[in-house]
A protein has these predicted regions:
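Auxiliary tRNA-acceptor-end handling modules of aminoacyl-tRNA synthetases
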Residues: 1-157, 161, 173
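Short, flexible turn/loop "capping" segments at secondary-structure junctions
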Residues: 163-166
Length: 176
């Protein structure tokens, strides 16, 4: 039977003490501990990998989103909102279905395959090609704030850093 052994060495006792101090600081400042303690968000067993945002945390989230919106608006972005459940045909066309399907939440309804949206790119391309445009209309700057979901393996979930559901500030530029 094999057993893995980890070792760490330091040039001096001072370096070791600094390392141990940093480990303790990291534990003290861990967002997985601070978020619930500060009343910002929680994770519950009924929805693994999806945050339940509490009032203070969601207020903070909205403040950041509004700040970002102002920046994008000043730079000429148009804000859009696209469906968060989309036909698998779109993802087959974009290539995501073949390469990313194992990370998507699939839904079967009325004999059709759908998936929750893991990224905005294909939907933004649908919006772009929905009308004839002149090169004079470019660049087209599209921004979206919306929910996305990705099926991350349970062993990879890590607080807010690796989740299954999140809101993303996403933008695409269509240029000539």
């Amino acid at each position: 039977q094999l057993q893995r052994v980890y070792g760490t060495s330091f040039e001096s006792k001072k370096d070791l003490e600094q390392y141990l101090f940093q480990l303790e600081e990291a534990k003290r400042r861990d967002h997985r501990k601070l978020g619930p303690e500060l009343g910002l968000y929680r994770f519950e067993d009924v929805a693994p990998g999806f945050a339940f945002w509490l009032d203070k945390g969601y207020r903070l989230y909205r403040e950041l989103e509004n700040w970002s919106r102002k920046l994008q608006e000043a730079r000429g972005y148009e804000e859009v909102s696209t469906p968060w459940i989309v036909s698998s045909k779109l993802y087959e066309t974009s290539g995501h279905w073949q390469h990313y399907r194992h990370n998507m939440f699939e839904i079967r309804s009325e004999d059709q395959d759908f998936a929750t949206k893991p990224m905005n790119c294909p939907c933004h391309c649908v919006l772009y090609k929905s009308q004839i445009r002149s090169y004079r209309d470019l660049p087209l700057k599209i921004a979206e704030y919306g929910p996305l979901s990705r099926f991350e393996a349970s062993g990879t979930l890590h607080g807010l850093l690796r989740v299954r559901g999140f809101h993303q500030d996403d933008a695409h530029l269509f240029v000539r």
